[in-house]
């Protein structure tokens, strides 16, 4: 299997009143079927990088695992598109209907699944982190400058975790949920505590993205785009600071503004 996140392909382009042949970068879509204790759990459409992190983060987001010690083994067979996961426990009855679900790269889950499972295991943030406006603007600038494949293709979501100064991890994926799951998996693998960390994200803060941030455990989420009304409601309920429209030296704070302090004070 070719593990390139993007590939050059021939296209016909129209520009300045003319049609001409050229090449363009396409992002790669890769179906990964996750097998848990020998049973098919889900198929995720993703970018073919950091797949072990993706699998671990995805299982944690689904509530199938709570910590690294519950994993017995994770074997990635990227030539066939399978991830074989062994757990030190049974999944239980609540995951029976999850079998053979397809998680598309561009779409969230159904509203029913989201409310029954996702919201139930989201954590209320106890984060005590504070940030200055300059830190917020600098982190978003750094995320965008690090996203060279997005600049080439326009087709990937980017996300990072930071303490306000240092990026601990930066990941990209064709699916916005996958990008966050890769961060989550990275932190679980390395036992990184994220309570006083920041999630920086390139996409819109939807309710599902906000729930994902709550599962990861961060207290602040930053985005260059706007949140939805339900995302802001959830952010207030879960004690998460949501900051959006970070661009041109400004931003909007939608929930829990007490974590953002004036650098002039």
Swiss-Prot record:
GO molecular function terms noted in the UniProt entry: sulfur carrier activity; sulfurtransferase activity
Main localization, broad class: cytoplasm
Catalytic residues, chain numbering: 107
One GO cellular component term noted in the UniProt record for this chain: cytoplasm
Alphabetical list of HAMAP family matching this protein: FdhD (MF_00187)
TM region positions: none
Functional summary from the UniProt entry: Required for formate dehydrogenase (FDH) activity. Acts as a sulfur carrier protein that transfers sulfur from IscS to the molybdenum cofactor prior to its insertion into FDH.
NCBIfam families: fdhD_narQ
Top-level taxon of origin: Bacteria
Organism: Staphylococcus aureus (strain bovine RF122 / ET3-1)
SUPFAM superfamilies to which the protein is assigned, alphabetical: Cytidine deaminase-like (SSF53927)
Protein name stated in the entry: Sulfur carrier protein FdhD
A GO biological process held by the record: Mo-molybdopterin cofactor biosynthetic process
């Amino acid at each position: 299997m070719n593990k390139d996140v993007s590939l050059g392909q021939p296209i016909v382009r129209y520009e300045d009143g003319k049609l001409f042949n050229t090449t363009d970068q396409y992002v790669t879509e890769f179906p990964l079927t996750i097998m848990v204790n020998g049973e098919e759990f889900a198929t995720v459409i993703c970018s073919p990088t950091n797949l072990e992190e993706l699998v671990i983060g995805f299982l944690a987001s689904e509530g199938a695992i709570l910590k690294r010690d519950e994993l017995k083994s994770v074997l990635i067979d990227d030539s066939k598109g399978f991830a074989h996961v062994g757990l030190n426990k049974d999944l239980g009855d609540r995951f029976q209907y999850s079998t053979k679900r397809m998680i598309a790269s561009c779409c969230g889950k159904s509203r029913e699944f989201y409310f029954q499972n996702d919201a139930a295991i989201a954590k209320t943030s106890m984060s005590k982190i504070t940030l200055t406006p300059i830190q917020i603007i600098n982190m978003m600038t750094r995320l965008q400058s690090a996203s060279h494949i997005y600049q080439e293709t326009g087709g990937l979501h980017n996300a990072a975790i930071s303490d306000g100064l240092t990026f601990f991890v930066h990941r990209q994926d064709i699916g916005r949920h996958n990008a966050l799951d890769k961060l989550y998996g990275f932190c679980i693998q390395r036992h990184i505590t994220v309570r006083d960390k920041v999630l920086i994200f390139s996409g819109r803060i939807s309710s599902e993205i906000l729930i994902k941030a709550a599962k990861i455990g961060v207290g602040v989420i930053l985005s260059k785009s706007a949140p939805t009304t339900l995302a802001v409601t959830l952010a207030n309920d879960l004690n998460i600071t949501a900051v959006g429209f970070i661009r041109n030296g400004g931003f909007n704070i939608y929930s829990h503004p007490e974590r953002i302090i004036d650098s002039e004070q």
